């Protein structure tokens, strides 16, 4: 208790020093009422925001002097009543912006303005936003109206709005933790593999300094749920037990939304093991909530006890702080975080950690792709500083060369045409996030030029995930952005795509004699509607299944891919039935969201600055070892391929 009181006193002193600087630099007519840390930001509450806004450089100057991210918010006393404020906003903003919703958050003095053309709400050089602030006093926050309505995005916004008071209290606690005075000068850094080392699944990496503990990813291996020791990260690691027991974990950072990287997050809240901040990009927050909900629904439908409850996912939402690419934030007294594009799925990020005052810099790639795809730009390879690189090795084997993307697309269309010609159906199992949208873009283009004339059905979470993609066009590839913004055409909205609403529609598609293309989750045939399609379509030789993504060991997808022709499966009444696989089985690996062997080696060649050390993870044992050996031989860089529970001292 004495320790905590001491730290609180230290933060109060830091804030007193900051107030002295702010009071000196900010004009008195701004009428400052409160200054407080909220998350990684310093928030200044004022009665007259326009006194600060009229000087466009003041906030920048303050940030430089204080070396903090600054936000200015209106004092609650000066806020115009919501009804009057809403009327004024509609008068100020051009009708062409097409505002679809306005919502007020009194606890932080923000007004959320949802518009189809957010740029017009912002105005040239932010002029319209400043005018809104001057007239209504509320701090405007502008978001894009998704062209496809997403229930996930709507529910997240509702939660953040209704829980705003608790969230403000939470952010203040986080801020005080971040800006506490360090007890120690940073002298050493260690990383420990809690999952995803020499394996694919349950990724979890613990970064430790003598001041801080930060966890990067916390996933679940859905293919191993019958064996918790292989499915979950290593809760049994002594240092991790200690960190959780003592409440010392400063932050969790999520690289992307796939369950093997974020699937265990709500579990921590269910059992009160963590109450701190989660950092990720806005699309990742939305997508991981979608996939976590889908995960427990599939568990329930399979008669299993879900790992966590919807209210635990709600806690994840309340504790998540989003960052866009390139934004630098302090997340503990000695660790600064920046997220960079990883090119794997929407919102996926390479985590860059700047530790100490230039002591050490780590980049953790998560899953990444180093060539441009239809959906995304290639992964970032330039960092301000870099000593240690932790990189994935999913396709790190010497022979893991994927076919060129153009050839993969040609092969996909060829298999589809051959299947349709003989009156069959094409099943493409795909992760709801990433591969599904990549394949959709290929099929949309070919359909537009008359190459495909059969319906394309989207089942599982794919349609909702696609709706989230439409809400974040700024995260998509340059070509897609040009199509959407300059050409006024959004390929995600094409009429060729038909979402499957329920099990009855699904059965009608299966029973129909008409050819069709079906894209369904999950991508590895582990739960979800893709399993039901497979059961009923597999016996017919007219049909085809096309795998376009990695099939992990232990999954039904891996069994089918490896050529097993008779597969025992549990039916609806709990009886085991043998499914005969007479359908054609194809694997087209050119659509993978993972870098292949050439891309991995090319990334090492081009990453700047060149790291002193590379650690290979997220791959089968031999692939991690093979990649590490090859990097050392070719580039002379020190490499390691550690096991789970190994700890490596970086400094």
UniProtKB/Swiss-Prot annotation:
Belongs to the metallo-beta-lactamase superfamily. RNA-metabolizing metallo-beta-lactamase-like family. FttA subfamily. Pfam families: Beta-Casp, KH_TffA, Lactamase_B_6, RMMBL. The keyword Hydrolase applies. The lineage of its organism: Archaea, Methanobacteriati, Methanobacteriota, Thermococci, Thermococcales. NCBIfam families: arCOG00543. It is an enzyme of class 3 (hydrolase). GO terms for molecular function: DNA binding; exonuclease activity; RNA binding; RNA endonuclease activity; zinc ion binding. InterPro entries: aCPSF1 (IPR019975), Beta_Casp (IPR022712), KH_dom (IPR004087), KH_dom-like_a/b (IPR015946), KH_sf_prok-type (IPR009019), MBL (IPR050698), Metallo-B-lactamas (IPR001279), RibonucZ/Hydroxyglut_hydro (IPR036866). Binds 2 Zn(2+) ions, which are required for nuclease activity. Residues 12-79 are annotated as: KHa. One of its GO terms (biological process) is DNA-templated transcription termination. Residues 593-651 are annotated as: Metallo-beta-lactamase C-terminus. Its cofactor is Zn(2+). It comes from the Archaea. Its EC number is 3.1.-.-. The gene is fttA. Residues 188-398 are annotated as: Metallo-beta-lactamase N-terminus. Homodimer. Interacts with RNA polymerase (RNAP), interacts with the Spt4-Spt5 complex. Zn(2+) 2 binds at residues 260-261, 367, 618. Zn(2+) 1 binds at residues 256, 258, 344, 367. Residues 1-200 are annotated as: Archaeal CPSF-KH domain. Terminates transcription on the whole genome. Termination is linked to FttA-mediated RNA cleavage and does not require NTP hydrolysis. Cleaves endonucleolytically at the RNA exit channel of RNA polymerase (RNAP); the 5'-3' exonuclease activity of this protein degrades the nascent RNA released from RNAP. Has nuclease activity on single-stranded RNA. Residues 399-592 are annotated as: Beta-Casp. This is Transcription termination factor FttA.
């Amino acid at each position: 208790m004495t320790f905590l009181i001491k730290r609180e006193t230290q933060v109060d002193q830091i804030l007193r020093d900051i107030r002295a600087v702010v009071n000196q630099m900010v004009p008195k007519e701004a009428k400052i009422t409160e200054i407080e840390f909220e998350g990684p930001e310093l928030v200044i509450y004022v009665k007259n925001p326009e006194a600060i806004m009229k000087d466009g450089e003041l906030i920048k100057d303050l940030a430089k002097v204080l070396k903090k991210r600054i936000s200015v918010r209106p004092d609650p006393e000066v806020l115009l009543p919501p009804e009057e404020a809403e009327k004024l906003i509609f008068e100020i903003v051009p009708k062409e912006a097409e505002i679809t919703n306005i919502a007020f958050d009194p606890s932080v003095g923000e007004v959320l303005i949802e518009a189809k053309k957010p740029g017009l709400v912002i105005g040239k050089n932010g002029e319209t936003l400043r005018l809104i602030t001057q007239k209504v006093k509320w701090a405007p926050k502008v978001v894009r109206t998704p062209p496809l309505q997403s229930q996930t995005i709507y529910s997240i916004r509702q939660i953040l709005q209704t829980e705003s008071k608790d969230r403000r209290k939470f952010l203040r606690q986080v801020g005080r933790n971040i800006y506490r005075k360090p007890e120690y000068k940073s002298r050493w850094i260690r990383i420990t593999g809690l999952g995803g080392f020499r394996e694919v699944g349950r990724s979890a990496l613990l970064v430790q300094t003598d001041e801080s503990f930060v966890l990067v990813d916390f996933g679940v291996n859905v293919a191993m749920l019958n064996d918790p020791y292989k499915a979950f990260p290593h809760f049994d690691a002594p240092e991790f037990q200690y960190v959780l027991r003592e409440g010392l974990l400063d932050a969790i950072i999520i690289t992307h939304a796939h369950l093997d990287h974020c699937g265990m997050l709500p579990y921590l809240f269910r059992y009160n093991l963590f109450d701190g901040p989660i950092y990720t990009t806005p699309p990742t927050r939305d997508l991981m909530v979608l996939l976590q909900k889908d995960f427990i629904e599939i568990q329930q439908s399979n008669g299993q006890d879900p790992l966590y409850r919807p209210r635990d996912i709600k806690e994840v939402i309340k504790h998540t702080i989003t960052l866009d690419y390139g934004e630098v934030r302090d997340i503990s007294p000695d660790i600064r975080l920046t997220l960079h594009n990883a090119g794997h799925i929407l919102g996926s990020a390479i985590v860059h950690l700047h530790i100490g005052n230039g002591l050490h810099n780590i980049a953790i790639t998560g899953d990444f792709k180093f060539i441009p795809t239809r959906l995304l730009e290639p992964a970032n390879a330039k960092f301000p500083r870099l000593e240690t690189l932790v990189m994935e090795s999913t396709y790190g084997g010497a022979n893991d060369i994927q076919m060129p993307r153009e050839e993969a697309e040609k092969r996909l269309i060829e298999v589809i045409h051959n299947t349709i010609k003989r009156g069959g159906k094409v099943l493409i199992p795909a992760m709801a996030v990433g591969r599904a949208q990549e394949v959709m873009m290929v099929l949309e283009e070919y359909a537009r030029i008359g190459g495909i004339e059969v319906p394309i059905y989207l089942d599982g979470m794919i349609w909702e995930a696609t709706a989230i993609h439409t809400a974040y066009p700024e995260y998509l590839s340059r070509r897609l952005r040009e199509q959407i913004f300059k050409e006024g055409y959004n390929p995600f909205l094409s009429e060729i795509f038909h979402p499957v609403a329920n099990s009855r529609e699904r059965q009608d598609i299966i029973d129909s004699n008409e050819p069709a293309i079906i894209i369904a989750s999950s991508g590895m045939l582990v739960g979800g509607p893709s399993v039901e399609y497979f059961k009923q379509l597999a016996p017919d030789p007219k049909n085809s299944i096309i795998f376009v993504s990695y099939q992990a060991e232990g999954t039904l997808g891996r069994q089918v891919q490896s050529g097993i022709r008779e597969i025992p499966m549990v039916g609806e009444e709990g009886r085991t039935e043998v499914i005969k696989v007479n359908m054609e089985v194809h694997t087209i690996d050119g659509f993978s969201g993972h870098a292949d062997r050439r891309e991995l080696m090319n990334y090492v060649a081009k990453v700047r600055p060149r790291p002193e050390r590379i650690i290979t993870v997220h791959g089968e044992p031999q692939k991690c070892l093979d990649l590490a050996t090859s990097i050392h031989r070719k580039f002379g860089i020190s490499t390691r391929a550690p096991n789970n529970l190994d700890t490596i001292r970086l400094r």
